[in-house]
Amino acid sequence: MNQLLSGLRAAAEPTRLRILALCARGELTVSDLTAILGQSQPRVSRHLKVLVEAGLLQRLREGTWAFYRLSDTGAAAGLARGLVGFIPEGNDVVARDRERLEAVKSLRADIASSFFRRNAGEWDDIRKLYINDEEVERTLLALLPQREVHSLLDIGTGTGRILEVFGKEIDRGVGIDLSREMLAVARVNLDKLGLLNCHVRYGDMNQLPLTYESFDAVTFHLVLHYAEDPAAAIREAVRFLDPGGRLVVVDFAPHEEEKLRTEHAHRWLGFEDGEVRSWFKAAGLTPGRTVRLPGNPLTVCLWPATRDGAKARAGVPAAALEART
């Protein structure tokens, strides 16, 4: 009851309702909101502080920046969505805010497109070395059937492609990446598809920017070869995987393409099946059957595993269960 009253009090102000309506349509910075609302940064920041403290908004750090979005976990998350639903669609102020929001998103898209064009050649060079992405995605979907995945954590999300693949069927998706430029591209891609149930965060796979959130599926899609300590990255991911949840590593079998190390910063030139399975077991996972997709010259492997233990109780995060044991 107290949290409900706190949330209602926090939202009971015109500007804060406008902020909730805007953040329901995507992740926004203080600068974005200042431009849209036509108010000073200190004033907007004060409103945001109140909404975050009430649990209506999430604040996601990204270096010196912070992005705000409607909360998707916690007791106040449903209240936030409910309040936005009561805001009249035809309100003139809300309509103007949306027009300005579209201008902000258009600028973001231009910046992301520029980054993509500068790097597309490099990405295409790597893609030519292995089987097409569509086949990899089809195999991943077979290992993680969409009807069985409700919440997904994609580590090293890049352009957000895996969130796009699963986004329409899951309740919630979170992507983590260390590249702000990649995150900018991912935000634009998710926004174009209207995937408001998915968002991305800045963070390191060795120290995930999560607290007591949990997921019933975790993916590492062609990213573990960048890790200094792949076993540690898997252990960190398992902290946020529900008991009975599934984790899939998508990466290369051992190869001799040295240019991927020298020109593209790959730390590891593929992984042996046995070593990945040993990392799984050490992290409390039961390995499944490895799927190999031969290419020329690279073979993509999909290593599935299941976290030991019964399915988590509804509403009890994996990290919270771990903290109690």
Specify the residue positions occupied by each region the protein language model found:
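N-terminal helix-turn-helix DNA-binding core of bacterial DNA-binding proteins
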Residues: 2-43, 64-73, 139-141
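Amphipathic alpha-helical dimerization/coiled-coil segments
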Residues: 75-124
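Conserved alpha-helix/loop element of class I SAM-dependent methyltransferases that forms part
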Residues: 131-150
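Class I SAM-dependent methyltransferase SAM/SAH-binding core
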Residues: 153, 157-207
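A short acidic, Gly/Pro-enriched loop at the edge of an enzyme's catalytic core
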Residues: 206-218
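A short SAM/SAH-binding and catalytic strip from SAM-dependent methyltransferases
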Residues: 216-229
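A short glycine-rich, Lys/Arg-flanked "PGG" loop and its adjoining helix->strand segment in the class I
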Residues: 231-246
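C-terminal alpha-helical "lid/dimerization" subdomain adjacent to the S-adenosyl-L-methionine
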Residues: 246-304
